[in-house]
Amino acid sequence: MNYFILLFVATFLLLDVNCKKDGYPVDANNCKFECWKNEYCDELCKAKRAESGYCYKLKLSCWCEGLPDDEPTKTSDRCYGTGR
């Protein structure tokens, strides 16, 4: 039984499992991308290797679904360099 568990864990490590996340993508200044149209956000998110994206109208910001874990997303309200 222990060998089965060890083999199972080793298989996952070898497969390099990529996790996905959802969130607001950010630029180099940690600022969200402003938007008006869903098409703009969908293209932006897919360029960042996400599955899809849309314009979240209440915040006028792009929201991406299925972003790779290594892609930065908005974690604070701070936007460096622009005062926003």
Swiss-Prot record:
Belongs to the long (4 C-C) scorpion toxin superfamily. Sodium channel inhibitor family. Alpha subfamily. The keyword Secreted applies. Keywords: Amidation, Disulfide bond, Ion channel impairing toxin, Neurotoxin, Secreted, Signal, Toxin, Voltage-gated sodium channel impairing toxin. One of its GO terms (molecular function) is sodium channel inhibitor activity. This is Beta-toxin Ct16. Gene3D superfamilies: Knottin, scorpion toxin-like. Its main location: secreted. One of its GO terms (biological process) is defense response. Transmembrane segments: none annotated. CDD domains: neurotoxins_LC_scorpion.
